[in-house]
């Protein structure tokens, strides 16, 4: 039977394109993501019909993106830690609140036509790994590849020798070599194996 659900609005965790696709196919409904923080009393960013980043009210919220190491602003369009300042007059103001979230401000205008700025969310710093080349990798990025290969639950182990191992427990799933190549490029590894 067809579900009467037309749309799902999610929040509380990152949403990869692969997970969005899986949910949309399962529910036969559009999936939208919302971004919030209890420190700011709820949602601060929402996806529009384009599903291409979180629009946020820049008259109420000022967002800086800074280097996790130095606290200095990163170049426009680059990933860093979101630092939030609320601009409303009443209540509990936040001044340069260091969130621990890795984000980037999207520079291009949204196809929906809104003038509100947007940001992309990559995950919590504590969930991400900084590679030897300085690149931050989030679970969202790994999940794009693993979910597409039919792997719902996995762990990626990075080794000091420049290799990585994808540990998964999916009966009957044998990842294609393409998955290992994609992870090798993403993780800047010499070799990726599975078990």
Which residue ranges define each predicted feature?
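Active-site glycine/GP-rich loop and adjacent strand/helix microenvironment
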Residues: 1-195
């Amino acid at each position: 039977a067809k579900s009467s659900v037309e749309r799902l609005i999610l929040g509380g965790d990152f949403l990869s394109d692969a997970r969005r696709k899986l949910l949309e196919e399962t529910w036969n409904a559009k999936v939208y993501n919302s971004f919030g923080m209890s420190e700011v009393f709820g949602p601060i960013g929402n996806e529009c019909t384009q599903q291409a980043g979180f629009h946020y009210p820049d008259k109420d919220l000022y967002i800086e993106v800074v280097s996790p190491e130095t606290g200095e602003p990163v170049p426009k369009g680059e990933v860093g830690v979101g630092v939030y300042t609320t601009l409303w007059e009443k209540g509990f103001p936040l001044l340069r609140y260091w969130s621990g979230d890795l984000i980037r401000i999207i520079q291009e205008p949204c196809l929906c036509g809104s003038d509100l700025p947007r940001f992309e969310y990559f995950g919590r710093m504590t969930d991400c790994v900084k590679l030897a080349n300085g690149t931050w990798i989030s679970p969202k990025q790994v999940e794009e590849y693993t979910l597409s290969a039919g792997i719902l639950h996995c762990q990626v182990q990075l080794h000091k020798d420049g290799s990585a191992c994808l540990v998964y427990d999916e009966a009957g799933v044998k990842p294609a070599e393409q998955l290992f190549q994609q992870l090798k490029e993403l993780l800047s590894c010499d070799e990726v194996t599975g078990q």
